[in-house]
Amino acid sequence: MRHFKVKAMVQSLDISAITGQQTDAEPSKRSKPSALRRTLQALRQRLTKRNRPKPPDWFLEKFSNTTNTDKIGKGCPAMEDAALSSEIRGSSVLCNRLSVDPTLQSHYRWLAIVSLAVLYNIIFVVGRAVFWEINKSAPAFWYTLDYLCDFIYLLDTLVHMHEGFLDQGLLVRDAFRLRRHYFHTKGWYLDVLSMLPTDLAYIWWPPETCSSLYLPCPVIVRLNRLLRINRLWEWFDRTETATGYPNAFRICKVVLAILVLIHWNACMYFAISYEIGFSSDSWVYNLNGTRNNTLQRQYIYSFYWSTLTLTTIGETPTPENDVEYLFVVADFLAGVLIFATIVGNIGSMISNMNVARVEFQNRMDGVKQYMAFRRVGHELEARVIRWFAYTWSQSGALDEERVLAALPDKLKAEIAIQVHMDTLKQVRIFHDTEPGLLEALVLKLKLQVFSPGDYICRKGDVGKEMYIVKRGKLSVVGDDGITVLATLGAGSVFGEVSVLEIAGNRTGNRRTANVRSLGYSDLFCLAKRDLWETLSDYPEARSTLTQRGCQLLRKDGLLDEQIFADSQRVHDSIEGGIEKLELSVENLNMRLARLLAEYTASQAKIKQRLAKLEMNGGPGTWRLECEPQSRARSGRLYSLQPKRRPRSRPDATAKSSDAAKQNTL
């Protein structure tokens, strides 16, 4: 709103200034614009430019995976009929209203609000249950905060009930399925228990009864609000994952846990002092005196005693009865276990924060030892050390390949495109190239750092890489190494034609100049081998890149047209031969498949005939005995042999029938 008000004010002032000037001065004698008018115009232009939406980037649009159908498809799982677009749109809106995506930033902010309510109950419900002066100071204020937190709990129950979950990799948004899933989780029971109206106990146990004579205070009935602590852990996990400083956040989380434990233990000490009796001995809290009877003194002393006990420092009054001894022993044991764990976690966090520095220092020490062992000159050793220092100052010696190794290739390609977008735009031969080719090439870019005075390439060297300047200055020098012919800055590209190996290149794919780094320079390198490995899967892109490379060579007069034409004819003839060979292989495969089908069909027919003969044949009949079809084709004929039924007695009928069944072909 403030931005639009300022813009409107500037426009109104500008208009008034213009009208005033036109009325005061004649049209033929218009004076020059005043300084105020020029200032207002510049301010209006700046505000308009800032408010103007950023135009879409053509380079990133080629890699965009989101479409309109994807946006529509994010509705209910039952959206399958594309023809019913209106119903799909209506059901999508309805499901989206009844579901919450837990990955959205708005859901994370809501968790932060719920976490504040939970943290309030963790600290003040326990504290107000023991320190009665807190409730007496501002009861209306505390009741307002209590029921505000209850309202947040109620809203969070509705949000939690409609939180989407993943089923077979898809986010479920159907309201009925979300509620059914929620009612079968542990969170449902915790939410219900944390929302029980235990404040109804105030009817029989009024909060006004809280005093030094009646502890704990009635607010202790709200302890069930602490059961919503799982939402606080969820917010901690989300924050630790999303933050750019996870180690610092972990340390803050551990410190918060320590303070909460000390706070609870201080409340326990004050409650035990009440049970034993204030001022009854030297161990319990001494309530005598005006100063000791204040809330500030009571809490600070209890917190101090709790800190000394849990940290096992001691130096507290000696217990005098069994209850005091048991409480102190339990505190010491809890302090040893809890703080040993906490100190160990903090130590590991601090060591993890310095892992990159330690690894980098070890590598640098190893290089130093090697140079000392090989007696490398002091000048070269100093250059190496300066290179290490520059690398650490720029990127912290970050190994990008190792960091991104856990990601799939698709995500790595998208990250690389976002990071190297401006770099790839500078390469002329890659303009309007297939997105798949650029996705494959962007993963093969290697970052190289050159020190002052390092030669990136020399004249006459075989071109095996192309370079893209990311940061720094390069100079193109003559053969004497002194004369500067040109200066290259960020975004400059050189060597892109040499990696294409174009026949007819008068330079013979060799470097035509000496390129030297003026200061520390960061260059992206693309090797010829990586380029051609990628182009093997993109034949059309390969021909396109070759044509663009030829155009660049023709522009500089470095292409021999005759040699290039001859190579193209040879290449076309080879390509034609390969196509004919592929066509012949395809025809042979088709013929082989047809013959195999005929053979399989004939085998099936023969098996059917044999099975039919076996079923129809019986004793005293002629049976066909044949050899396999392969033998029959070799010249062997079928043979007919009579099978006579043997004479047998009536009681041997079963045996003769069994013997007849055993006659085979």
UniProtKB/Swiss-Prot annotation:
UniProtKB keywords: cGMP, cGMP-binding, Glycoprotein, Ion channel, Ion transport, Ligand-gated ion channel, Membrane, Nucleotide-binding, Transmembrane, Transmembrane helix, Transport
Cytoplasmic topological segments: 1-110, 160-186, 275-325, 503-665
Record-listed 3',5'-cyclic GMP binding positions: 437-559
Glycosylated residues (UniProt): 135
Disulfide bridge positions per record: none
Native species: Drosophila melanogaster (Fruit fly)
Topological type in the membrane: Multi-pass membrane protein
PANTHER family assigned to the protein according to its UniProt record, in alphabetical order: CYCLIC NUCLEOTIDE-GATED CATION CHANNEL SUBUNIT A (PTHR45638:SF11)
GO cellular component: intracellular cyclic nucleotide activated cation channel complex; plasma membrane
Residues in the Extracellular compartment per record: 132-138, 208-253, 347-481
Domain of life of the organism encoding this protein: Eukaryota
Family, similarity comment: Belongs to the cyclic nucleotide-gated cation channel (TC 1.A.1.5) family.
Tissue specificity field: Expressed in antennae and the visual system.
Protein name: Cyclic nucleotide-gated cation channel subunit A
Gene3D superfamilies for the chain: 1.10.287.70, 1.20.5.300, Helix hairpin bin, Jelly Rolls
Function: Approximately 50-fold more sensitive to cGMP than to cAMP. May be involved in transduction cascades of both invertebrate photoreceptors and olfactory sensillae.
GO molecular function: cGMP binding; intracellularly cAMP-activated cation channel activity; intracellularly cGMP-activated cation channel activity; intracellularly cyclic nucleotide-activated monoatomic cation channel activity; protein-containing complex binding
Biased composition (Polar residues): 654-665
GO biological process: monoatomic cation transmembrane transport; response to hypoxia
Cellular compartment(s): Membrane
Major subcellular site: membrane
